[in-house]
Amino acid sequence: MGEEERSIHNLSLPKKAIDFFESEWGIERLHPPQFEAMGPLFDQHNILLAIPTASGKSLVAYIAILNQLLNHNPGSRAVYIVPLKALASEKFEELKEIGQHLGLKIGLGIGDATSEAKNIDDSDILICTSEKLDSLMRSRSE
């Protein structure tokens, strides 16, 4: 697979998403493992991506989320689950930047505060810990 083939311009995402990744994050092409994941993702398959730390798993997840929200299920919502509050905050900042460029609302659920409720309810993409997701599901099923 050549570098040209791995260009982000070959992704089936709206131009504004491609432009964001290129101009704001300096991403011009995907790494080989990221590129290999794109076929199944854009064909609506679930994948398990096991690659080293800092090799681009989050970008693959962001592209998968954007593909669903912008291409296949406009008006739907996504949940990005992480194990730690610190990681949730980090991903929130990244996704908030994407959301500002693409008109998506990003929510963060990591605490017990009722002030989070509106943020959670209004978000297109919710980033939360597994514990918070469990709490949300239990409290809303009652």
Located regions from the model:
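Interdomain "pre-motor" coupling segment immediately N-terminal to P-loop NTPase/helicase cores
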Residues: 1-10
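Pyridoxal 5′-phosphate
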Residues: 14
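Conserved P-loop/Walker A NTP-binding site and adjacent catalytic elements of P-loop NTPases
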Residues: 18-142
